[in-house]
Amino acid sequence: MQEIIIQVMNQFGYFGVAFLIMIENIFPPIPSEVILTFGGFMTTYSELGIIGMIIAATIGSVLGALILYFVGRLLSVERLEKLVSGRLGKVLRLKPEDITKAEKWFLKRGYATIFFCRFIPLIRSLISIPAGSAKMKLPSFLILTTLGTLIWNIVLVCLGAALGDNWEMIAGILDSYSSVVVVILGIIFILAILIFVKKRFFPKNKNYSSDTEK
């Protein structure tokens, strides 16, 4: 996949970057870190500039996020879970739990989630769906999405440009970072379930405790 990404970017320049980043938002398995860091490297040997690369990547990110936002407005979370539980989920490499996780992040943390989740693998794309389902105001969604993706794009493009031929090193580090984040999110999810079960089915009997003390 990396070779295809590089070919598209070399052939189509800014348009290729915008297109690939847009697809990356809709199809999470496509690695944005490869696109952005190689895009930064491209600025060292081609006519493409860092600012233009960042703008192209940000436009692609926002367009991809908008598509998922409107998908969320049209389809309920339950419907999306059913869709990804079948063949579509295998193609996109998504599970119903991924949709549920993104929804919980949004409902628990509110609008700020749209900004901060742009730095978290997988959820950075899926968080747009619950935002649409919750009928989040489009201007707010656009502002937070643009700011979050802009920062992410600036960092990776500049790193790619600074490292030059060693741009793949960043992609490798971020790939490990993605794996660690997914594991951490899984642990947090399991702990949340355990806490819920404990509070729901094993509540402390305060009355009994007070009676015993008397």
Swiss-Prot record:
Topology term for the membrane: Multi-pass membrane protein
Name this polypeptide is given: Alkaline phosphatase-like protein
Keyword Kinase: no
Species for this entry: Lactococcus lactis subsp. lactis (strain IL1403)
Domain of life: Bacteria
InterPro entries: DedA_domain, VTT_dom
Alphabetical UniProt keywords: Cell membrane, Membrane, Transmembrane, Transmembrane helix
PANTHER family: ALKALINE PHOSPHATASE LIKE PROTEIN (PTHR42709), UNDECAPRENYL PHOSPHATE TRANSPORTER A (PTHR42709:SF6)
Subcellular location: Cell membrane
Membrane-crossing segments per the record: 48-68, 141-161, 177-197
Listed GO CC annotations: plasma membrane
Family indicated by similarity: Belongs to the DedA family.
The keyword Cell membrane is annotated on this UniProt entry: yes
